[in-house]
From Swiss-Prot:
GO terms for biological process: cytochrome complex assembly; establishment of localization in cell; inflammatory response; innate immune response; mucus secretion; positive regulation of defense response to bacterium; positive regulation of interleukin-6 production; positive regulation of mucus secretion. Residues 134-191 are annotated as: Disordered. Phosphorylation at Thr-147 enhances NADPH oxidase activity by promoting NCF1/p47-phox binding. Ubiquitinated at Lys-149 likely by RNF145. It is found in: Cell membrane. The gene is CYBA. It comes from Bos taurus (Bovine). This is Cytochrome b-245 light chain. Signal peptide: none annotated. Pfam families: Cytochrom_B558a. Residues 2-7, 54-69, 81-86, 127-191 are cytoplasmic. The modification Phosphothreonine is found at T147. There is a cross-link at K149 (Glycyl lysine isopeptide (Lys-Gly) (interchain with G-Cter in ubiquitin)). The chain crosses the membrane at residues 8-30, 36-53, 87-104, 106-126. Component of the phagocyte NADPH oxidase core complex/cytochrome b558 complex, composed of CYBB (heavy chain (beta)) and CYBA (light chain (alpha)). Component of the phagocyte NADPH oxidase complex composed of an obligatory core heterodimer formed by the membrane proteins CYBA and CYBB and the cytosolic regulatory subunits NCF1/p47-phox, NCF2/p67-phox, NCF4/p40-phox and the small GTPase RAC1 or RAC2. Interacts with NCF1 (via SH3 domain). Interacts with SH3PXD2A. Interacts with DUOX1, DUOX2 and TPO. Interacts with NOX4; this interaction mediates superoxide generation.
Amino acid sequence: MGQIEWAMWANEQALASGLILITGGIVATAGQFTQWYLGAYSIAAGVLVCLLEYPRGKRSKGSTMERCGQKYLTRVVKLFGPLTRNYYIRAFLHLGLAVPAGFLLATILGTACLAIASGIYLLAAIRGEQWSPIEPKPKERPQIGGTIKQPPSNPPPRPPAEARKKPSEEAAGVPTGGPQENPMPVNDEVV
């Protein structure tokens, strides 16, 4: 069996955590909780986490499915260089963003999810993984001479391949697919 790429799981967990933080922050702010400012903080932290985590990283083996519109955010994430590429930094950033939101009931679920994502990122960093962008593959242009095949010699409709006569069978005296002669006499008497 192959190695588990932990960063892929951490990315999904952190993105979901960001969305949960935003939702909890909206509930806390709109509900005018006692510490509503922590709800506003959770909205900002959730947006930051979502922007950081939306671009998927390239897998070391196999292919990676790019998210819709990811290429635009990938450029932004690439600008920060080692700050976003290193999973140790991401793990501690997520853990630091999660702590203040943990003091409010509406955002505690997002805090727990983000703390779990932080732990998974720490595991990925210990295993030596790092974020690398998904680069678009250059499209290979088909060579013009290589794709043209011999045109068919029979006009349509053509018989199936197994029904076509082969020149070697015809020369060998193999009977063709014409009518056969019945060795038994047939009477057409109707009673």
